[in-house]
Amino acid sequence: MQELKGIGASAGIAIAKAYRLEEPDLTVEKKNISDSEAEVSRFDEAIARSKEELEKIKEHALKELGQDKADIFSAHLLVLSDPELLNPVKEKISTDSVNAEFALKETSSMFVTMFESMDNEYMKERAADIRDVTKRVTGHLLGVEIPNPSMISEEVIIVAEDLTPSDTAQLNREFVKGFTTDIGGRTSHSAIMARSLEIPAVVGTKAATGTIQNGVTVIVDGINGDVIIDPSAETVKEYEEKHNAYLAQKAEWAKLVNEPTVSKDGHHVELAANIGTPDDVKGVLENGGEAVGLYRTEFLYMGRDQLPTEDEQFDAYKTVLERMEGKSVVVRTLDIGGDKELPYLQLPKEMNPFLGYRAIRLCLEEQEIFRTQLRALLRASTYGNLKIMFPMIATVNEFKEAKAILLEEKEKLVKAGQAVSDDIEVGMMVEIPSTAVIADQFAKEVDFFSIGTNDLIQYTMAADRMNERVSYLYQPYNPAILRLITLVIEAAHKEGKWVGMCGEMAGDEIAIPILLGLGLDEFSMSATSILPARTQISKLSKQEAESFKEKILSMSTTEEVVAFVKETFK
């Protein structure tokens, strides 16, 4: 019996035989060719066949996983139509008289290396897209079949170096009980897909493929990030009991689907969900979400080759508002730049894009893009309970300017006879430390705050959470972070305004009792975290949590805070 430690990417426990998803031999040799025109035609044919396959995979992903996951394959299809990739391959075939496989390998390797060297998560994901697409096209050129996980017909746990988006989208939930990989993290494509499919997964083990043989029994514990190879009968029994306990826990959570979120001493807080597309609303309602606390509208702009029209945006916003049936929907205006780029929007190359031209800064300069989105939102406002918030606000003047543009567009629509809701709350994200420090000034201008802890933490601690060498400094429970959060909540409440939180911290079991004690009004998280959080809050006393507020805020280290919370609220 052996044990590997990785990252629990999708909760649950699975026990089954290992199925190694072997990488095909796609060794490419350089060959000189005499008929470059015929070779270019061979390349075009491989591209066409790859597009056909991806269209089918995209259709399957849309049906099984929803629009945002299908959009991954829209991005792949864009790569297969991108002249910046295809033209250099064809030029290399013609100029160097080399075979298509070699020309593709050389060109794609150059792009992958370039993208992976960027300090930008979005561009790193594009490198993964190019690798995935290149593998598929190369397979067609070599006549090598690419493994198809949808053909698996017995209960297995997949073992792979990594799973591409194409692999994961083709997993058959009936037979694939879980998977484990050598590489990857919680935010990798495969991890996100696993959570959508509710398949237990452990990624980043570093040694799964080097240790696990085909057919051996494997346990995947996606809750704790453990992989047990060839377990004893006693260990199998132990994990079967853990699996049953997890299912019982899920059943307990399910009882609270239609219940409000109320603490042990009767205090109500709102549990909301973060979404990226209209299809995500289904998960919000199935998990008992009381609101949408963050609608990330940038997904409307990604995976396509041009800006979405006003009508396309209107349809998306209207759909979300209608499906939420009067429950609050907080829409964040376009947050592009930093780790999210648009291929059709020529953003300047910056030394540090996270501190550069992004989000509201871009929108205030590219006003036609901003105004189009605001018009679509205003037109949709009569179909539900819409709230609008601006991201990455750094100064009071930025907020005032953004709100003034919103009011200008509202006035134009009303004059044109368009119905617009009269009670749209307008708020802002708190992601920049300077904003938290003068939250009392912002509180006079806004209707609400939403604290984006992911960025607030990394800006406050000067630590990129994606950089493994400094990730130890990404500390949600650091007293400095907790004091900033307190400044925001106290400033808002003094002005009679409410405060939400839409970063990962909002659904964290260590953070929840702290945030309850600090007075947070709305906790917005992934939909699958809502019921566990509701269960936890129902067992907490707000009065007790408040009584420890000063003690926690007077602590000096993260470790001290965590130890106290674990001991006090165990």
Curated annotation (Swiss-Prot):
Q: Where is the active site?
A: H189, C502
Name the InterPro entries on file.
PEP-util_enz_mobile_dom, PEP-utilizing_PTS_enzyme, PEP_util_AS, PEP_util_C, PEP_util_CS, Phosphohistidine_dom_sf, PTS_EI, PTS_EI-like
A single GO CC term, please? cytoplasm
Q: What does this protein do?
A: General (non sugar-specific) component of the phosphoenolpyruvate-dependent sugar phosphotransferase system (sugar PTS). This major carbohydrate active-transport system catalyzes the phosphorylation of incoming sugar substrates concomitantly with their translocation across the cell membrane. Enzyme I transfers the phosphoryl group from phosphoenolpyruvate (PEP) to the phosphoryl carrier protein (HPr).
Per the record, the similarity remark reads: Belongs to the PEP-utilizing enzyme family.
Assembly with partners or alone: Homodimer. Interacts with FloT.
| Name of the protein described by the UniProt record | Phosphoenolpyruvate-protein phosphotransferase
Q: Which organism is it from?
A: Bacillus subtilis (strain 168)
The taxonomy runs:
Bacteria, Bacillati, Bacillota, Bacilli, Bacillales
Q: Which gene encodes it?
A: ptsI
